[in-house]
UniProtKB/Swiss-Prot annotation:
<comment type="similarity">
    <text>Belongs to the triosephosphate isomerase family.</text>
</comment>
<dbReference type="GO" id="GO:0019563">
    <property type="term" value="P:glycerol catabolic process"/>
</dbReference>
<keyword id="KW-0324">Glycolysis</keyword>
<dbReference type="InterPro" id="IPR000652">
    <property type="entry name" value="Triosephosphate_isomerase"/>
</dbReference>
<comment type="pathway">
    <text>Carbohydrate degradation; glycolysis; D-glyceraldehyde 3-phosphate from glycerone phosphate: step 1/1.</text>
</comment>
<dbReference type="GO" id="GO:0006094">
    <property type="term" value="P:gluconeogenesis"/>
</dbReference>
<feature type="binding site">
    <location>
        <position position="194"/>
    </location>
    <ligand>
        <name>substrate</name>
    </ligand>
</feature>
<feature type="active site" description="Proton acceptor">
    <location>
        <position position="158"/>
    </location>
</feature>
<comment type="pathway">
    <text>Carbohydrate biosynthesis; gluconeogenesis.</text>
</comment>
<dbReference type="InterPro" id="IPR022896">
    <property type="entry name" value="TrioseP_Isoase_bac/euk"/>
</dbReference>
<dbReference type="InterPro" id="IPR035990">
    <property type="entry name" value="TIM_sf"/>
</dbReference>
<dbReference type="Pfam" id="PF00121">
    <property type="entry name" value="TIM"/>
</dbReference>
<feature type="binding site">
    <location>
        <position position="164"/>
    </location>
    <ligand>
        <name>substrate</name>
    </ligand>
</feature>
<feature type="binding site">
    <location>
        <begin position="6"/>
        <end position="8"/>
    </location>
    <ligand>
        <name>substrate</name>
    </ligand>
</feature>
<dbReference type="GO" id="GO:0046166">
    <property type="term" value="P:glyceraldehyde-3-phosphate biosynthetic process"/>
</dbReference>
<keyword id="KW-0312">Gluconeogenesis</keyword>
<dbReference type="GO" id="GO:0004807">
    <property type="term" value="F:triose-phosphate isomerase activity"/>
</dbReference>
Length: 232
């Protein structure tokens, strides 16, 4: 079971260090059954920590470069300093808020694949697309250019209308989309979108579900630990 936490624009270096200590202690004790590569935490770039033992740290965003004249961006050299080899690509907040194009998403994918990084590739439809019923076409388009056979690929289904709204997709909706995605790739499939303490257990048991990508419910260490307890 893969459990990923997107901390988004939350946590300072000090607060994330405290987060990591609490989580490491939990994972080394009563939750030692979780493997390090099953728990992925994506802090903001300014909070990267080099004192992590029992989980994997990843990057929410990066620019497809080693280094260079790219003001405000972070490249592979910076990620390498912290041993980061897991990245989020294609998140709807990057696409919508920051106007990240399909071309840039593809460039990031190619860059990460070339380096053997573990990629959580996010796909999802808007509420309008969902109501119109053509979400399968939209999801197919989002996946059309990437290598679905890449060995370090994870696909996260995050319907845009469920992200940060407190309104998770219904189990039958999640199950249908995951089945559709499973026909396209053998990559592990995650669900993300208002995952919380009340629904995480049921979601994790759905067919084709290999785990979850959690947003706000994971931002505090105690809350994230309680979510992990639901999966034990």
């Amino acid at each position: 079971m893969i459990v990923a936490a997107n901390l988004k624009c939350n946590h300072t270096r000090a607060s994330f260090l405290n987060f990591t200590k609490k989580l490491d202690n939990f994972l080394s004790g009563e939750a030692s059954n979780f493997k390090k590569n099953e728990i992925l935490i994506f802090p903001p770039n300014t909070a990267f920590c080099d004192q992590i033992s029992n989980f994997t740290q990843g990057a929410q965003n990066f620019f497809p470069c080693e280094n260079g004249s790219f003001t405000g961006e972070i490249g592979a050299d910076m990620l390498n300093e912290f041993g980061i080899k897991s990245v989020l690509i294609g998140h709807s907040e990057r696409r919508v808020i920051f106007s990240e194009s399909d071309r840039m998403v593809l460039e990031k994918f190619k860059f990460a694949k070339k380096r053997g990084w573990r990629i959580i590739f996010c796909v999802g439809e808007s509420d309008i697309v969902r109501m119109n019923g053509n979400y399968r076409e939209v999801l197919s388009d989002q996946l059309s250019e990437i290598d679905l056979d890449y060995e370090n690929l994870i696909i996260a289904y995050e319907p845009i209308w469920a992200i940060g709204t407190g309104k998770s997709a219904k189990n039958e909706q999640i199950e249908e989309v995951l089945e559709f995605l499973a026909e396209k790739t053998e990559a592990p499939l995650l669900y993300g979108g208002s995952v919380n303490l009340k629904n995480i257990s049921q979601i994790s048991k759905l067919p084709h579900c290999s785990g979850v990508l959690i947003g706000s419910a994971s931002w505090e260490a105690e809350n994230f630990i309680n979510l992990l307890k639901e999966l034990q």
